Amino acid sequence: SMEEAVNEVGSQLGRRGEADLALVFASTAYASDLPRLLPLLRRELSSRHWLGAAGGGVVGTRADGTAAEIEQAPSLSVTLLNLPGAAIDSVALSTTSLPDLDGSAQTWQEWSGLNPQHCRSQILLIDPTSSNINDLISGMDYAFPGAEKIGGIACPHNAPHGSLLFDDRVVTGA
């Protein structure tokens, strides 16, 4: 069950103190329970920021330290990052109404709420039901050309909510 997976993660990582960022990846086997996942994890782990997605396959490290990829089966992976001196700005973006791609970079920067002078890297996770995915990626590249970007598109599922985990809620968009 998801509760057992959360308890196992908590027993492995709970003694580490507060992290700056928690990256959470849950298999779509837990799709209907995604709204409960972050509140359960927050009881076990402490992090200033939470970000994650549902996936068809989840990569992580087992309790014995070996790497594993689990596909199409219940799985949960949590990575806690301590980033001394880093400033983390987390934003949830709606992809339904993007700025014009022919507009200014400043318009995209203001729309995203990110300061280009402090944005050296980005983790961009996108819900598979989002519209304008290519335009979003192009716009973020245009607005933040010097920022390194990593991320991907979450896995679709049949639950009536998004696939992205953001702070304490499940969202769509990016």
Predicted regions and their residues:
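Cofactor- and metal-binding active-site motifs of prokaryotic enzymes
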Residues: S1-A174
